[in-house]
């Protein structure tokens, strides 16, 4: 009987999940996005971020992981080998503090099947390109490289790799901030999405169109005794997506032809907030945004590149009796320092509801967020801008919750009229 149930389970897993391109639903995908992370570099009791990368298919697969700063400058990449139905858990503190990368290996680097053992129904094959790379010899990041990574993710100058330039925002603390992408690939790639050959139409580059990856993540703060979790953003590939589509990696692909084939994210959202009562810690919005430019390291004297901070089309805050407040926002680029609120200025951030960045006098309700913004990037899709929004609510030392915002609009079809606002008086 056990074998019968296992056969039925595997049959279900082998069947393709129902998915609609341009909705960013929670189904196996070719790219995963951890929209925001935090890691306290000095305290083991401080905040850290955990994530998992999982394989939904029986076929072995390679995943290429890229760590980006909160201004979308890549600072580290590595590969993870997954046997069929495999799971790889990662604590970002292990990487960013200790310099240790996940230990995995394909069959050619693991002939005794002790590093990445396979199950009875899982494929385990050799990726010859991984020879000399996998498994990593930890600590894989030496002191020089680790200093570069930590400096980049805390807004400090990186002398060795970036010539003394900066690549992130200096928040005045030792919390590493940024985001992570994970792509299905067909070799142990050592390049980034903007490199020639990383993408090819129909999944013919290093990155493939295998919609088999899924995962989740947790923010854990031992010192404050709480954790929140959510699924990663699952970004599907579809070979029919091209030049007329605002794809996820559109700002990077050659000649802006959409050859990454990845669906775009949302531009308009609805999200609940609680700013009082038992949730004494309030609500924070965690956002990822696409500046629509391939970012480069910049002079630390500038604080950030010229087209930041990022503004938005409209923010409307409702209470539970449909009363509303409309914080004045910024609609030109770059946002003048005195031009209304700028709650989501960077590519990845945490914003406290009720703070000066996102003010409201209400305690409970929901927010309408139209995060379209014209800044000169990807002019063929102006004013569309893709984003992701989540919310975390907590009561310090007692309990916490986290969940994704509701997506009201999506940029994939490239329809520039997709710019809804709420009539306010």
Task: Please place each PLM-identified region on the residue numbering.
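Short beta-strand and strand-turn-strand segments in soluble, beta-rich domains
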Residues: 66-78
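A structural motif detector for short, solvent-exposed N-terminal "entry" segments of globular domains
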Residues: 20-54
């Amino acid at each position: 009987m056990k074998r019968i149930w296992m056969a039925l389970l595997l049959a279900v897993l082998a069947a393709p999940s129902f998915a609609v391109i341009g909705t960013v639903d929670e189904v196996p995908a070719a790219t995963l996005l951890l929209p925001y992370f935090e890691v306290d570099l000095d305290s083991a009791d401080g905040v850290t971020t955990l994530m998992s990368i999982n394989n939904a298919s029986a076929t072995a697969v390679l995943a290429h992981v890229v760590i980006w700063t909160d201004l979308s400058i890549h600072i580290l990449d590595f590969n993870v080998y997954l046997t069929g139905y495999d799971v790889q858990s990662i604590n970002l503190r292990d990487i960013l503090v200790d310099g240790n990368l996940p230990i995995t290996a394909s069959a050619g680097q693991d002939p005794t099947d002790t590093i990445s053992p396979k199950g009875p129904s899982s494929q385990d094959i050799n990726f010859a390109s991984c020879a000399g790379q996998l498994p990593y010899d930890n600590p894989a990041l030496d002191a020089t490289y680790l200093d570069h990574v930590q400096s980049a993710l805390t807004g400090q100058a990186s002398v060795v790799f970036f010539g003394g330039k900066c690549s992130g925002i200096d928040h005045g603390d030792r919390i590493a901030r940024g985001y992570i992408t994970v792509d299905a690939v067909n070799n142990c790639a050592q390049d980034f999405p903007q490199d020639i050959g990383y993408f090819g139409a129909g999944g013919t580059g290093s990155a493939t169109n295998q919609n088999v990856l899924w995962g989740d993540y947790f923010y854990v703060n031992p010192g404050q005794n709480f954790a929140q979790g959510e699924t990663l953003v699952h970004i599907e590939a579809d070979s029919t997506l091209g030049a007329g589509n605002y794809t996820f990696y559109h700002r990077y692909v050659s000649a802006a032809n959409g050859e990454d084939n990845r669906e775009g994210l949302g531009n308009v959202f609805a999200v609940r907030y609680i700013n009082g009562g038992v949730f004494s810690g309030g609500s924070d919005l965690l956002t990822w945004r696409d500046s629509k430019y391939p970012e480069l390291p910049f002079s630390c004297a500038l604080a950030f590149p010229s087209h930041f901070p990022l503004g938005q089309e409209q923010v409307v805050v409702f209470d539970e009796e449909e009363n509303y407040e409309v914080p004045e926002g910024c609609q030109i680029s770059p946002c003048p320092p005195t031009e209304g609120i700028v709650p989501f200025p960077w590519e990845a951030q945490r914003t406290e509801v009720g703070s000066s960045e996102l003010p409201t006098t209400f305690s409970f309700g929901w927010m309408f967020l139209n995060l379209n913004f014209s800044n000169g990037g990807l002019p063929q899709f102006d004013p569309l801008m893709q984003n992701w929004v989540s919310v975390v609510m907590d009561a310090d030392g007692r309990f916490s919750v986290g969940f994704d915002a509701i997506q009201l609009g999506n940029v994939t079809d490239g329809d520039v009229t997709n710019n809804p606002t709420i009539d306010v008086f």
